[in-house]
């Protein structure tokens, strides 16, 4: 069994924790300044360090006793890019992303590695950009997109990943001509 501490905090803003049976002894060490993560070092249960991507995005893994883990990707300045949960190597649960200005970019949910539920996207200014419904990896339900003005751009209906109907509007709100959906 792998046991992970809840960690501790020092007055300099460093938070740290450890795996009891980890070769290196350390699981994670995070440094905060003004409530913002400025440095992160993490290790897998094997003692192998976690990494930075080629795009300069930091990656932190936290492992739970039940074998699940959650992953946080962050910008170099410590602001979170995304947070997702994994179970048995597959994404499972919520996956949320943010712009560097801390505005939420997207929110989606996964079930055993397949997108399941509502997927919502926002623009960098916080205005809703679109939303889709999924059922076990397939589009199922209503899909909407909006213009930056907030005007509806499109509404489509899906069933088992097959398009049933779609209506589109011009930026001025005028409905576009009907189009038939064919197999």
Question: Positions of the model-derived regions?
Answer:
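Glycine/tyrosine- and acidic-biased, solvent-exposed loop/turn segments at the edges of beta-strands
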Residues: 1-183
